[in-house]
Amino acid sequence: KQLAGAMQAAGASLRGRGGIRYIYYQGEVKQLVESSHKEVRVERSFTILEDVNCPAVLAEQCFVTSDTDVAQFGSEDGCKRTARAYYEAICAYFETTPLPEE
């Protein structure tokens, strides 16, 4: 939620509930599950999230097919705002204070 909020503050339009969706695959069928869904799922999601021994997030915040996303985040400034949003979200997760921007 921290990352979704930071990306929204940086100018991104959020998709899903508060910018968070879970995706599960059953064979070839893709199923989106909104963040408000509380049922424990047995289906695997993405291997990168399932087979790691540390906290992991797979984030997708911009689409190259979206003129709005490209305009907001395709520049050097947009990349810096995105990097800052990720950095601050990671700091919040580990309960550390981010260093000030230069």
Where are these regions (language model features)?
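Active-site-proximal helix/loop segments of hydrolytic enzymes
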Residues: 1-102
